[in-house]
Amino acid sequence: GKMLAAVSRVLSGVAQKPASRVLVASRTFANDATFEIKKCDLHRLEEGPPVTTVLTREDGLKYYRMMQTVRRMELKADQLYKQKIIRGFCHLCDGQEACCVGLEAGINPTDHLITAYRAHGFTFTRGLSVREILAELTGRRGGCGKGKGGSMHMYAKNFYGGNGIVGAQVPLGAGIALACKYNGKDEVCLTLYGDGAANQGQIFEAYNMAALWKLPCVFICENNRYGMGTSVERAAASTDYYKRGDFIPGLRVDGMDILCVREATRFAAAYCRSGKGPILMELQTYRYHGHSMSDPGVSYRTREEIQEVRSKSDPIMLLKDRMVNSNLASVEELKEIDVEVRKEIEDAAQFATADPEPPLEELGYHIYCNDPPFEVRGANQWIKFKSIS
């Protein structure tokens, strides 16, 4: 037994030494490279974002790590869900990593972002750790909402969630943009919704107010082709979501290309900051998972369709190929990042399964900022719930 343990220790020691380190050290990489990106379709705009962009080695490595982290985190959530450690609603965004990472790359940390319930990726790109996100999914005290929000209700600084009601975040986003303007801040709000929510009346009401008041609001339709199990063609009389703001200018963007998303976001944010009012972006993307964990995702589309997107337009693969072919990084170096990311996810999952759940007496915490002054029929219902942080 001891002998075996010793042998396995030696072997694992050998396995852990990154052989590629020597290679990487001796090789020189380009500091940056210029790439052609797909031209955006425009609505009510004379010109759009540039069709070439420069990617630095440093940014490329950062984007790659972030996208890979979101992908692995979602796959880990899938695994924990199947083990019944995560319960209830759970909407995964694998396939859409170029959207959350690309949008973040195009704005400042002081800008604002609000989205619907497919929010894990944005929660991460807005600055929370994988630990806090996975622990929130498993309902533990170390989660970003102390385990009470779950998959659809996570928040970070300048990130207003996760919202469980379809489309309800859009008027809220217009409100955040109103606050930016009212307070005289040079900030914008990215207001996201899906193709399923795009047919909601409240979205058109928000368009109208935002245009009337020239709010710095970037309305972003993440079009992943299916609202639950309904394809866009079956749900919308016009699937040109970028044109549906009518009097609001729009862009249709390749949402599988992080550089396309980044440039379009920079363009849209600059448009809003210049005081011209709102602008619309449609990100054409794709989700590999079903709508939620209860949806296998193959009754309304074929496995072949999913496989084709994976093999031809995967956002992570696209970035990787560009970086390797332009001498911005080596395959070995990117593999090393993959190993580090996997380890980070494993550690986070360990924490998310070992961390304690909040006790029942904390049920009423954080409902009121302090003990509420009112009584109902002569009794204070909340007396037993002390509100403490």
Curated annotation (Swiss-Prot):
Catalytic activity: N(6)-[(R)-lipoyl]-L-lysyl-[protein] + pyruvate + H(+) = N(6)-[(R)-S(8)-acetyldihydrolipoyl]-L-lysyl-[protein] + CO2
Cellular component, GO annotation: mitochondrial matrix; pyruvate dehydrogenase complex
Pfam families: E1_dh (PF00676)
Regulation: Pyruvate dehydrogenase activity is inhibited by phosphorylation of PDHA1; it is reactivated by dephosphorylation.
Enzyme kind, highest EC tier: oxidoreductase
Gene Ontology molecular function: metal ion binding; pyruvate dehydrogenase (acetyl-transferring) activity
InterPro entries: DH_E1, PDH_E1_Alpha_Subunit, Pyrv_DH_E1_asu_subgrp-y, THDP-binding
Compartment(s) of residence: Mitochondrion matrix
Binding-site list for Mg(2+): 195, 224, 226
Protein name: Pyruvate dehydrogenase E1 component subunit alpha, somatic form, mitochondrial
